[in-house]
Amino acid sequence: MKKLILSLVTVATLCGLAVQAEDKPKTETNVSNPSNDEVAVITTVEGTMVLEFWPDVAPNHVENFKKLAKSGFYDGTAFHRVIKGFMIQGGDPLTKDDSKQSQWGTGGPGWKVKAEFNKKSHVRGVLSAARSQDPDSAGSQFFICHDRATFLDGQYTAYGKLIKGDEVLEKINSTQTGPQDRPVKKMTMTSVKIVPRAEALK
């Protein structure tokens, strides 16, 4: 399995979003009637974040995330890539296994989701799909913007936003990192649940 890195150029800064590569994956499309009354509750070693979804602009990405979360796919994964002032990235199932650290950033669910580029801007707290150079290569990996990153607009599929737990985003983004922007302390997501909005915000 080949690790793919998509380089992003903004002014004189070169940033990379490591994404998964799957061998001849099938494509998930045509999801019908996703609901917007559910949110994602991501419990991490640094606290809990709640994210709302935008099914009106990215229905397939929303439903893909929900399906993976409801199956327990994300439980025990980690935010394996943290770039201060930019974003935190997670969703790779390989991060459950510390013996596979050299492969972190290459894992996925075994299928791809076609791009749903939209007019939502990549500002702080926005949830977006990580991908390779192929626009239709998103799978399970995602990132949450720590700061405005409008140079990603129209190139990455934004499909939700942080609505509770901004201090947790700050803690994770501030953690010490080493080579490959990997946190020194493992930023594990102990659970990722899909629950009614009212329940998550009470």
Task: Name the predicted role of every residue range.
Residues 4-8, 16-202:
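Cyclophilin-like peptidyl-prolyl cis-trans isomerases
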